[in-house]
Amino acid sequence: MHDFQFRAKGDKRLKAFSLQDLKKSHTVNIKWRFQKNNDNGQVITYVIDNINKQHCVVEACKRIYKRAISLKIPQDRPIAVFTQEKMGRNKTSYINDIHIKNLLQEAAKNEYNIHCKKELSAFTSHSIRVGACVLLHTQNISPEDIKFRLRWRSDTFRTYLRNNLQLAEKHRDAIANA
């Protein structure tokens, strides 16, 4: 639970483990314990999105935090957990890359009607970071900011950039306005 630090407006620290204070959260600082780039312990700040709460990192962190408290997860343990029923009993498990891969592949089947195993194999836990990279690129975020915010040490993120509908529309509009 120490990997999330919630703050109110004005960067005021909130009391740790207070569900009442959690409602005042304006930002969350997330400590990334282990990273592929070995920049372990890096802290990144996320700001609440009051317009699009469904995709708000702060709101997601609040749900994760509340779930960890309700499941009595020890404070020194990872809090990305879920419960599932196995043999008539609820079992708490840590969310791992296999769970994420399975959820993303199921979403790809349901949302995009993808059923080819080879195509589905492209949907992995890394897809979230790649998708964020592509989305930021389509929104004209600078390569330096993409690299910094998504924790890339090299320029390999550029290999993930794709042609997509948003870029095709910008290309069309640029030609139309030329």
Spans of model-derived segments:
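Extended, non-catalytic subsegments within catalytic or DNA/protein-binding/adaptor domains
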Residues: M1-A178
